[in-house]
Regions:
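Short, intrinsically disordered, low-complexity terminal/loop segments
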Residues: 1-4, 294-296
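N-terminal signal-anchor/first transmembrane alpha helix
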Residues: 2-54, 132, 210-211
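A short amphipathic helical element positioned immediately N-terminal to and/or at the very start
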Residues: 16-24, 75-78, 86, 203, ...
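Generic structural signal for beta-strand residues in well-ordered domains
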Residues: 21-22, 68, 225, 257
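Hydrophobic alpha-helical transmembrane segments of membrane transport/permease proteins
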Residues: 28, 32, 36-81, 237-240
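Alpha-helical transmembrane segments of integral membrane proteins
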Residues: 81-296
Length: 296
């Protein structure tokens, strides 16, 4: 008589730890790069002895690693008027990050309010707000920013206003889409049935569902805003020329690419790396929070 052996118990698949979660490596890389930039922007101008706007004609166009007339080290060299390039970049990073964060707070506030109102109440108000958003999307955001900046003039506050006006639509459309998905669910209907008011439903049921998509959009848009601020400053429509900015530094070095390539190249590379880091972080957070992408 043949004996049939019982089947061996199936081994349980190892649980996915933090390292297996989607985008973990990319998130760590991007956060490391961003943390270095933030630390340099906060601490660098305090520790560096050089004034970013002090001119030293005797030290003009020194290449990276040169010694200045007072014996100091110009790590990234100097520009056409002898200003230390590293000091300008550190101060410019502070300006760019501050402008980016302030712009996102203002644009995010406008976009979230518009998106919640349009998505939750719907009807005529929804159609009006979304048609306004469509009209703004018909114009390239950078051209709209240039037009408004030309009217307001160069100023840090004006740059924040210009970029916020140019970027609120993305937040509004994402939040509206999320609100339309959430407002018809059973737990929202149950909350209304129990007598909860509109503000209570929005605050306890709708807004928490919008946190993840808004975080993803904000991360990606922060890189776009920093790049747009540099573009406006490059054109003379952003921060004043007396305020160190990556865009101003790149603009000052564009006429010296043959003899002093470092003036425009080094800030340009630093700007590109920061924008890429925010883009990578945004993509990784999207993969982490979007359930439709977790199986890919």
């Amino acid at each position: 008589m043949s004996v049939i052996a019982p089947p061996a118990p199936a081994e349980a698949a190892p649980a996915a730890g933090p390292a297996r979660r989607p985008g973990t490596a990319r998130i760590r890389f991007a956060l490391t790069v961003i943390a270095v930039y933030v630390a340099a922007a906060v601490v660098g101008p305090v520790l560096l002895a050089y004034d970013p706007v002090a001119t030293r004609t005797a030290d003009r166009l020194l290449p990276p690693g040169s010694r200045t007339s007072d014996g100091g080290l110009a790590v990234f060299g100097t520009d056409q008027v002898g200003q230390d390039l590293l000091a300008q970049m550190l101060q410019g990073a502070r300006v760019s990050i501050a402008v980016g964060v302030a712009t996102l707070l203002l644009a995010g506030l406008i976009g979230v309010v518009v998106g919640v109102v349009a998505g939750y109440f719907g009807g005529f108000l929804d159609g009006l707000l979304m048609r306004l958003a469509d009209v703004q999307l018909a114009f390239p955001s950078i051209l709209l920013a240039i037009f408004i900046a030309a009217l307001l003039g160069p100023s840090v506050v004006n740059v924040v206003i210009v970029l916020a006006v140019s970027n609120w639509v993305t937040f509004a459309r994402v939040v509206r889409s999320q609100v339309l998905t959430v407002r018809g669910r059973e737990f929202v209907d149950a909350t209304r049935t129990l007598g909860a008011g509109t503000w209570h439903v929005v605050r306890r049921c709708v807004l928490p569902a919008c946190v993840a998509p808004v975080l993803v959009v904000a991360t990606v848009e922060l890189g776009h805003v920093i790049l747009a601020e540099a573009a406006l400053s490059f054109l003379g429509l952003g921060t004043p020329a007396s305020t160190p900015s990556w865009g101003v530094t790149i603009a000052n070095g564009r006429n010296y690419l043959a003899e002093a390539w470092w003036i425009a190249t080094i800030p340009g590379l630093a700007l590109a790396l920061l924008v890429v880091a925010f883009g990578v972080l945004g993509d990784a957070l999207r993969d982490r929070f979007d359930p439709r992408l977790k199986s890919l």
